[in-house]
């Protein structure tokens, strides 16, 4: 009888422990989240979608105190703000901290890469899952593995003067960002003027530049189609720019179940974002048409000619990273292999040793 009572008490204790543990892990949680961008802006879309999906998936158990439009974190402050715990999560952009996280912008160096945004998202996610150095450079600043990999559209050109061919670009002054695109422009006789995207409008209006490089949605966001009526699709590079970063201490405090939930919601939000982006670009195209923007596409032959005279940016980047003790060649080789595996063929061979 005493033996049965002992067994009963042990089982009761186990069940009680399991009950308390499950309820503890399901305790409501409120996290601080920020974005340098307005809540309804293009560049905040990945973050906004994640919050909506998390609240649905968690049944309201995980909620957020939200800080939008740079009210708490400005673009150049993102890395430090997340790492130091000013916020628990924030819209993440590697491009604003290239000196601290130089590996995270690797894809910008692969000129004329696959413009399929889903492919680019998939490749970058796979590389972060298989190349430890990519996550380690964020962990160095106390940031957890990225939750979302959100691409923008391919870099194209909008111009105040007619442009259809490579010859039309020669001698033109072009607003360009990031800095590594300056030698690409110079390779065909263009004059690059380093400019952040918000400055494009004023510089075009004043005649400081003739045209600008950027993704179609960004060119539209800064309203260049109001003063520049010639669009040339060149598909120079399709980057996976947008992410969502979490403070590493916050991440470590999560239960295994909560971590799985955050990763699951991150992947789901990525899918929702890609679908949303497709629809957003349709609206951009319609607005371009309504505003009288003339659309042309650079020929494949012109792309090959341009690529042939460009510097080998992937190789240059790989060597620069290796000199810093970072796996530049591993990242370069892997990106090229995954691109080829996805069926993409570059107009020239990149990453030559």
Give the positions of each predicted feature.
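Bacterial N-terminal signal peptides that target proteins for export
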Residues: 1-10
